[in-house]
Swiss-Prot record:
Signal sequence segment: 1-20
Lipid linkage positions (GPI-like-anchor amidated asparagine): N118
Keywords: Cell membrane, Glycoprotein, GPI-anchor, Lipoprotein, Membrane, Signal
Propeptide segment residues: 119-147
Name this protein carries in UniProt: Ponticulin-like protein C5
Keyword Phosphoprotein part of the UniProt annotation: no
A GO molecular-function annotation: actin filament binding
UniProt-annotated glycosylation sites, renumbered to this chain: N118
Key word Nucleus present: no
Natural source organism: Dictyostelium discoideum
Amino acid sequence: MKLNNSLLLLIVAIIASSNAAETFSNFQVTNSEASSPCVTTPVELKVNTCQSACDSILNVLPVTGSTSKFTFNQFGAQDTKCAATPTSSNEFTCVDGKSKVAIGTTTYSVVCVPDKTNSSESDSSDSTRIGASFALFALALLSMLAL
């Protein structure tokens, strides 16, 4: 029974360490309107920044409690500071780094760019996870041998 519990704990720990949440720092947007400058060249939007993109003034705000779910706001052409109430807004979630979101009458394609400043998502994160998984496996093996 103790062996089964140790194996179960090992499996849960490995799964938990490999499923660390990915955070996103900015987005690249395009849309399907032929007249838009975003059709061939994606425009990068930064979180919490008022920017002009795709012939619109846009603002992407994070939703409280989530690092992959955001609110995409569209403002009027004159509102260069995104100070007024958005003309339209919609929430989207980054799934596998890509998403589509409808804002008003326009559908945007959004490519979510991972936040590389997050220490758990650095370029060496895969090797770190492998090392952590190996350490957990060794710890579980030692605890089983001690039984």
